[in-house]
UniProtKB/Swiss-Prot annotation:
Lineage: Bacteria, Pseudomonadati, Pseudomonadota, Gammaproteobacteria, Enterobacterales
UniProt EC number: 3.2.-.-
Record protein name field: Non-specific ribonucleoside hydrolase RihC
GO cellular component, one term: cytosol
GO biological process, one term: purine nucleobase metabolic process
Principal EC category: hydrolase
The species this protein was found in: Escherichia coli O157:H7
Amino acid sequence: MRLPIFLDTDPGIDDAVAIAAAIFAPELDLQLMTTVAGNVSVEKTTRNALQLLHFWNAEIPLAQGAAVPLVRAPRDAASVHGESGMAGYDFVEHNRKPLGIPAFLAIRDALMRAPEPVTLVAIGPLTNIALLLSQCPECKPYIRRLVIMGGSAGRGNCTPNAEFNIAADPEAAACVFRSGIEIVMCGLDVTNQAILTPDYLSTLPQLNRTGKMLHALFSHYRSGSMQSGLRMHDLCAIAWLVRPDLFTLKPCFVAVETQGEFTSGTTVVDIDGCLGKPANVQVALDLNVKGFQQWVAEVLALVP
């Protein structure tokens, strides 16, 4: 039985790998994609997502989502992904268009039509998910769980303590973490370990057309290097769905700091239970790196 999932994303180079795995991993049934502003503007993330769907000839509906965070000015990660979000490869022209409704309403409608609860996967800022939960609370029973790439129990990657996807819209993340839905958090504690080695990266052009495309994108990706290895942050959320045995999780109380001058966007992960609050998130703290790398190679070999 394939697991039905909806994917909320902000492509983004590592998003492209996660999208490939979500489409082609035989255990998963990707039924809806939505885009959000994050790595680059929502117009660019939508264009990039449509380009990828066309590249793989995937007939998956896509809805464009939030262009700005809930309450603050937008920030991006163009320094990591390039100004377009997916520089380095010339995709062919197409005439695909997003659905005519906002992402959170597309998610709501698809949830309400689904014959069983659906797993949501969010690998960008949580703006669309927060809008869904705040504007359409009747949808909560139809959400099996939410798996996110975001946050950290330790160091950050855009401030000393904050990870980009959470820091891009802390108010949205705080709303989601308070919502009461089941959450699995794949943060920097595991994603910084999720490295594709230079030896493997060098084989991609010979793998298939997707390997050639990803190799071209990776030459513009700044989360590591082709010489030292590249971090596949977003792919961890998809990997957990298929291979949860590769991850070590701990139930923790997690809150999001929205006010601090130096700490805004920090996920406060109470690993030791100091606050005495009930756990609201399953936090991934460790990764079987060799197993992850083997799984990635197996999945990408399935992609045409």
